């Protein structure tokens, strides 16, 4: 076992970067590590409220942090003052299952989306190579392109192609063991397996497969323990000539804080990008969607809709749904004129060619009582770092500027700094209501 205080200091540093000062003082500074007990870490917290908060929000971070620090699999046990005196030592074979832990997803069957097949995938210039590579992999898994690494923006069909490989392989070889999972689910399964002492079961589930499909691999960033586990999973499968397919929104070497040995392995096979569909492909996608929904839409109307949306397939199909709903409410046939009314004022992705990075910087600086020079500068104090990251995030979300361009506008910062800021804010938005409110306020201010 590592030194208890050294481990706790490491965990505190992690929490300090993840939590606000108020949150850190309220939850972390009031807790103290007591001792190791078998494969458990006893942590004393001052109240039932603190205990519930730790179990529901912070326990998984303790598991992850312990694995990162010393490659040990610890289960955190939270006790109130005086409770530790009544705890008896655990025998090695005893199991303690946290009541909060859910059944890991690897104990439940993972289903492929029945709609994501090669038959329903519309090919075009932006995805031809990815489609061809996916077909090859589905016919000869583990031979030519291993791993197959599909990368590109949101809503371009990466998940569709990935799952199509699984469907095709199962159709030709029904006995094949196919596993589809998001990177987030893999990480959660790994952490839950430690908490429930099911590590061996976890490894059997993920390593005893013929085809492993892992979606959105970029979310492994900052998860050192999960990366370590996936490294060994990858090696086992690759050495057994089992096929691995990964998707990401960027190339392996552009994923921040991804271990170099994983970057290297992800490049062993074929990295292939998927770009936004051209006009002809967008029309074909809409026609395919309309046929599937049994919609009667004139060709010129499909062309009009395709001309309005050039970002991704998801936005494109969403626009068609919007037009269909509008026609239903109006009790009218779908025409180009009706489509124009339905899509009027629609700002896809919230991006605006009129909105400048300078405007975003000005609004954010005023909101946080800072100067634009603060946002462009290099001071690393928390009161400036967060607003700076928010401004970079909004510049990425609300303008068409490239990463290097945004970095240049923020005092000549590297594009990877912008990528990290966008990733950090995106992840925080899933849990931080105050941040959500601030982003909404800022967006409304800039749109008004």
Curated annotation (Swiss-Prot):
Q: Which PROSITE patterns match?
A: DNAA (PS01008)
Give the GO terms filed under biological process for this record: DNA replication initiation; regulation of DNA replication
One Pfam entry for this protein is: Bac_DnaA
Domain II: annotated span: 72-110
Gene Ontology MF terms:
ATP binding; ATP hydrolysis activity; DNA replication origin binding; lipid binding
- Where is the region Domain IV, binds dsDNA? 328-448
Which Gene3D superfamilies does the UniProt entry name for this protein? 1.10.1750.10, 1.10.8.60, 3.30.300.180, P-loop containing nucleotide triphosphate hydrolases
User: What CDD domains does this protein map onto?
Assistant: AAA, Bac_DnaA_C
Q: Where do the record's region annotations for Domain III, AAA+ region lie?
A: 111-327
Q: State the compartments where it is located.
A: Cytoplasm
Per the UniProt record, which residue ranges are transmembrane?
none
Q: What family is it from?
A: Belongs to the DnaA family.
Could you give the domain comment from the record?
Answer: Domain I is involved in oligomerization and binding regulators, domain II is flexibile and of varying length in different bacteria, domain III forms the AAA+ region, while domain IV binds dsDNA.
What task does this protein carry out? Plays an essential role in the initiation and regulation of chromosomal replication. ATP-DnaA binds to the origin of replication (oriC) to initiate formation of the DNA replication initiation complex once per cell cycle. Binds the DnaA box (a 9 base pair repeat at the origin) and separates the double-stranded (ds)DNA. Forms a right-handed helical filament on oriC DNA; dsDNA binds to the exterior of the filament while single-stranded (ss)DNA is stabiized in the filament's interior.
Cite the record's note on assembly.
Oligomerizes as a right-handed, spiral filament on DNA at oriC.
The record's section on NCBIfam families has: DnaA
- The protein's name is Chromosomal replication initiator protein DnaA
The species is Latilactobacillus sakei subsp. sakei (strain 23K)
Native organism taxonomy: Bacteria, Bacillati, Bacillota, Bacilli, Lactobacillales
